């Protein structure tokens, strides 16, 4: 609708973890003249700790970045489409996803018709606590076994990849 696409850059992927010491970027590409080609681009954010983010979702003035072990929410307070740590906010919404710079781990978020955020993670496993203080233990036959066979606070035992939904504030994951 606005001619923009947001892209997560993954130059620092696995073997190349330190290829770009200044960190990877979340880029904005814009088609300003409606010809279907991006003619303007800029970095929304680039930080040294950004290493191969696997997903980016733009929800109003929030930019949700999926990068293990965290789901990070950048709030563009002044809506200028550039993250400024002096003005804007950065918050780790959820943390505990396994698989550093790994494509089998945490991926992008999307908003459902019910207003909840839907997201998925691959088979690397996870142990995370949502904002309603419930801990989820996702076992993995692929990586670490720390959560294997252990029930989550909702009573279920999870193994492998999973899909979840939650309130936008990170509460009530299910």
Task: Say what each PLM segment does.
Residues 1-174:
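Beta-propeller domains with acidic blade repeats across secreted/periplasmic ectodomains
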């Amino acid at each position: 609708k606005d001619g923009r696409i947001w892209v997560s850059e993954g130059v620092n992927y696995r073997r190349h973890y330190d290829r770009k010491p200044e960190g990877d970027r979340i880029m904005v590409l814009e088609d300003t003249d409606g010809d279907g080609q991006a003619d303007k681009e800029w970095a929304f954010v680039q930080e040294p700790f950004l290493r191969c983010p696997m997903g980016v979702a733009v929800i109003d003035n929030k930019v949700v970045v999926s990068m293990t072990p965290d789901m990070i929410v950048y709030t563009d307070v002044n809506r200028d489409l550039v993250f400024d740590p002096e003005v804007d906010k950065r918050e780790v919404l959820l943390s505990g996803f396994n698989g550093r710079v790994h494509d089998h781990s945490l991926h992008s978020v999307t908003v459902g018709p019910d207003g909840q955020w839907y997201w998925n993670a691959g088979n690397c496993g996870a142990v995370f606590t949502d904002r309603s203080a419930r801990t989820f233990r996702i076992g993995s036959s692929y990586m670490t076994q720390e959560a294997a066979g252990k029930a989550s606070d909702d009573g279920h035992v999870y193994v492998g990849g999973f899909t979840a939904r939650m309130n936008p504030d990170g509460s009530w994951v299910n």
